């Protein structure tokens, strides 16, 4: 079933699992067959926005007469995550302009997005490598080449000018939406100020590489820049687009970029904050949860069995343990789940 969603005057109709499964097969253990995922969204026509106005393909920037922060809203770090592209396309078509500061809207992995196929929607996450694992200076400054790394280098000069980034993402497996703020205090403050979705999680990222929110500009002890990643819901689902739009609107209000203030009659409660204390990375090709945990699920008791990684048992390290984005098709070397404690 497809659904419709209207915002900013626009009506919307509506490969991480594959990569992990392939990894398991290469290691000699057959991963279970992936389920068939419902695709409620259609990829938007981004052709009007490809030229942009910044000198970087797919990036468009608008400056207001009044001074203010430079805010970047970024979509398509992963080419199959359509929700962010739909939100930015709607913003551009609505001719939204900031009332202060500078607003930049960017589509990152356009080449992977161009390969999206609703019959195989997980395959176009990236072409050569995950674009959200290349954001350390050594990799960006090094000699290695890939389509995603080359594109990150194209985008980097814009990243180096922005004050705040909201990176729009979605998830393959069922999970409550959340904001990820990395390890920086400024990014934590920005995520709490955005406030929607109502869960903020601080973490150190993945063993496989650095995310955009881990880029040194946003994590350095000095400076003012901050970056937040919203995981707005499942890929290709209409409510995910609605959550992205809510997060974008909240950030623009926080930046003072919209004429109208937020609706104080519907002000949500303050978000909960949790900090990841342990990243579970699969060490074998036989990692398996004992049941299909949902992201955002809180496990009441310390010592609860969560998974087996070969012969090793994975158990909760404390009471009220938050499950952050469990991946149910995990190959060796990939993040299986993050365990977090509320504070």
Regions found by a protein language model. Give the residues of each.
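Structured catalytic-domain cores with a bias toward divalent-metal coordination
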Residues: 2-343
């Amino acid at each position: 079933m497809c659904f419709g969603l209207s915002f900013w005057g626009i009506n919307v109709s509506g490969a991480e699992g594959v990569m992990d499964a392939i990894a398991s097969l290469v290691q000699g253990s057959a991963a279970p067959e992936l389920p068939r995922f419902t695709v409620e969204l259609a990829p938007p026509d981004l052709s009007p926005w490809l030229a942009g106005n910044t000198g970087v393909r797919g990036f468009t920037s608008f400056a207001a007469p009044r001074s203010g922060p430079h805010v970047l809203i970024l979509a398509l770090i992963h080419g199959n995550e359509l929700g962010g592209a739909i939100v930015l396309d709607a913003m551009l078509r609505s001719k939204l302009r900031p009332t202060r500061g500078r607003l930049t809207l960017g589509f990152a992995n356009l080449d992977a997005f161009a390969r999206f196929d609703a019959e195989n929607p997980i395959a176009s996450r990236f072409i050569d490598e995950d674009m959200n694992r290349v954001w350390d200076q050594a990799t960006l400054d090094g000699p290695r080449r890939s389509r995603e790394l080359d594109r990150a280098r194209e985008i980097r000069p814009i990243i180096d000018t922005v004050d705040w980034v909201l990176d729009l993402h979605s998830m393959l497996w069922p999970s409550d939406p959340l904001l990820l703020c990395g390890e920086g205090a400024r990014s934590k403050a920005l995520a709490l100020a955005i406030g929607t979705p109502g869960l903020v999680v601080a973490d150190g990222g993945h063993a496989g590489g650095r995310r955009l929110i881990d880029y040194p500009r946003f994590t350095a002890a000095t400076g003012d820049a901050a970056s937040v990643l919203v995981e707005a819901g499942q890929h290709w689902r209409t409510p995910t687009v609605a959550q992205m739009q809510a997060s974008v609107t909240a950030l623009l209000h926080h930046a003072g970029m919209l004429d109208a203030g937020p609706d104080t009659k519907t002000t949500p409660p303050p978000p909960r904050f949790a900090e990841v204390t342990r990243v579970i990375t699969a060490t074998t090709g036989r990692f398996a949860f004992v049941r299909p945990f949902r992201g955002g699920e809180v496990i009441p008791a310390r010592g609860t069995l969560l998974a087996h990684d070969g012969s090793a048992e994975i158990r909760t390290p404390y009471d009220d343990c938050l499950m952050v984005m469990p991946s149910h098709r995990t190959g060796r070397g990939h993040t299986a789940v993050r365990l977090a404690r509320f504070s």
